[in-house]
Amino acid sequence: MKSPLYISSRAILFALCSGCLLLTSSLVFSQNEAPPYLDARYRHWADSVISTLSLDERIAQLIMIPAYSNKDQVHIDSISQLVKKHGVGGIIFFQGGPVRQATMTNQLQKISKVPLMISLDGEWGLKMRLDSTVRFPYQMALGAIEDENLLYEMGEEIAWQFRRTGVHVNFAPVVDINNNANNPVIGFRSFGEDKENVTRKSMAYMKGMQDHGVLASAKHFPGHGDTDVDSHYGLPVLHFSKKRLQEIELYPFRKLMEAGLGSVMVAHMNIPALDSTLNLASTLSHPIVTGLLKEEMGYEGLVFTDALNMQAVAKFYPPGVLDAKALLAGNDILLNTMDVPAAIREIKAALERHEITQEVIDEKVLKVLKAKAWMGLDHWKPIKTDNLIADLNRPKARYLSRKLTSASLTLLRNENDLLPVKGLENIKIATLSLGAADTTAFQKGLSRYGKMSHFFFPKEGGIQELQDLKQKLSDFQLVLVGIHGLGIRAGTNQFGITPEMNVLIRELTESHSLVVSVFGNVYSLAEIQGLDKVQGLIAAYQETPLTQDLVSQIIFGGIGAEGRLPVQVSSYFKKGNGLKTDGGFRMAYTDPEAIGIATDNLSGIDSLVHLAIREKAIPGAQVLVAKDGKVFYHKAFGHHTYDSLKAVDLEDLYDLASITKISTSLAAFMHLKGKGQFDEGETLGTYLSMARGTNKENLIYSDILTHQARLQSWIPFWKSTVRKSGKFKWYTMKSDSSRRFPIRVAQDLFIHRKYDQKIYKEILESPLNPEPGYVYSDLSFILAPKVVEEITGVPFFRYLDKNIYTPIGANNLTFNPYQHYPMSEIVPSELDELFRKQLLQGTVHDEGAAMLGGISGHAGLFGTANDLAKLMHLYLYDGLYAGQQLIAAGVISTYSKCQFCDKGNYRGMGFDRPNKPGDPNGNAAASAPETSFGHSGFTGTYTWIDPVNGLVYVFLSNRVYPTRENRKLYQLNIRTEVLEQVYQALNHPLRIKDK
């Protein structure tokens, strides 16, 4: 799933050397690369601006004030006043939205004498502060990733988003080494506890941003990772020697500075080894900011204070005095100044007292102005708010978030190679969400892979609920547990793990195979009892719909596990732990970009389906497309009916119509072929005793399956049950079920128990077509269940379910879904006004199949696009799926070939194939290769397999609603045109720089 990256020439060198970055950094960057804005070319504009500024205005350039785009006009006016009257140098934005912030930024920039430096805390991207944006993983999750190139790519994308939103500084990365599991403020915000790993990740993130025009800011100097006090609320004290600080905490700062780090944020901590002044925060310490950072470490870039409204400093000094002390300590930019006039006044007073010189102030101002020039503020342009949210949510960003998240997920236990889960036919699976009261995204993701029952245990669950749950789970062998709603910070009551949860996990490990997925702070693993005995354990680091989706895919083998623990959680779960698994075991679910297609290049699919709905060709549809086992397009459109009362869901079942032929009859025949129990060279009479002595006895199956056995196309069996008056003949149908009329044809309609024999007799006694040649026929497929049952002694559907559907997890492929599913989950077909006189929902549309009780080999199967795609992947991979060769190798590839092309019959055995080249009424997409195959269905369904390109395509609709006379779907050629859109997208792959 890894895609090539677009990176600059400098970044290419970075990528090549990332593995040896810290040992041979001179191969990647010069040992003393200066911050980018210190280049001489930015001096001219800075000099021209500073010459126009008064002393007050120069001091104000060193002040950055907080602003919120989600507050009222009073707040906006107050910020505007500070910009216009006092000329503050910058804004740090907090909570809000992209458009509101961009609009506010434009307003403020227009009234500012000097363009404003705009900043934001975006450790995991804009989402840290702004709604309606893409969320990237927490840094702790990123620390689990082995490929630093992904972090460079993230830095590049975040830089693009920041610049698109008019933001110039990202207060990231956090380079604190989190070697204290109880740290209440850093924790999940750190890349981990290993200084080399933290440095590699920070370097990649920093370079990705700065190579693309956004200033990085390493924080929190000199290292906030081993504290147990949150500096937002108090002053942490760091009791370490300077030697220890040099070896550990300062290490990543030093390495990033050597590589051109743009800025540093100084933390609020008391560090006696560096400055013994009582209750003095490092932010206010001249020995730390000037002595250590600037002089000893030689740092020349911008130095930001941490927010000056934090209690670690604010409770000791009033506004103004605090700002002056921070500037005197050596900081360049005062962040979150709470009283701008007081700050300017106190700094001027310090100047008058000769505690600071004009030269030092001017030096700081020039540095700020040069940085602004590097940021492009020397030619500022308003932010365009049109399409801003769409731009920030571009597919490239979403796919990058997926790649990062996937690479971070860490498999910590996999006893007996349990994962990916194998042999679905042999186990009964339950899912259990702890800390949740409703179906989670994790459970929904798991459900894509097979049949399972969902259970919940909320945080408030007690002993009685626990015992009840254990009883319900007693029938299951495998329980897939997700732990949800965890606290993200240390010290939050065991992260939300309750005693009852621990009891439940401990006791379940004694009676079940257990796979536990922890969606939260990785340190919470230490609070969960019994994890050393579970069969599978996955650390997900955070709880988002995406993490839950991807973890479900690891469990069933859609994707592999790659991550490694970036911290030591306990003596059992150590830093560096992480087991690998391979993906591709079952279908994966991903974005088009994963297979080299731009999402936007598939917009034609949406347009075609919407056209079909608008033209009333169909009320709705499910569409799925996969390449090489990766489902990259899976959408539901429209509604069950034109009244728009029920929207189509991806879990809804459609009547598959004639796709039943290749999904049931052909599946069984090919399975039996592999076992040596069926051969297409034999005759119908060989396998079906009732055919012997009839004109069908000697029909050869290779002719039958290619529709050239001279069988009639179809027989309207239902007409034999109806009188001229329109009423049913008394011996055929009844409105109530009984011993004689037990077979349900539709709601309140039951057929005689022996009527199937009449149907079979009518088929066997029907005349053969007088001339040889291709005539598409249902008749042999109606007989197919009897053939399979006679060969195997097993009922038709039971045979399919046991040998095909359950092993591949296609449990939604079923006959008579009304027996198993709510009607709201079954899409209706036709409003039948001739035969059944009702809306058909949950019973098969085809009359003949309905008269056989809904189970037939030519029609009757229902399913979702997802489950049908599993079967089509089995066919794509020549009978191999989820590690099992369910159909003998070579059988499907043989059956799907053109059997009688020399006779003008282009069909495979059972499968449809592209018509003769040049046929204007083709049954396949124009670009589909000759070797592709599939089938269509009368109700508006279609599926196609392309072995050359590794494609599986499924289109499900109910075009027969409300009447089968609606032929617009055919006339518009929607089904094959949708597939053609895929081919066109494949022919226009992503450029490397677009990935």
Predicted regions and their residues:
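Preference for extracellular/luminal or secreted protein segments
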Residues: 30-65, 69-82, 295, 317-594, ...
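Short, conserved catalytic-motif segment at the N-terminal edge
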Residues: 594-656, 677-679, 686, 839, ...
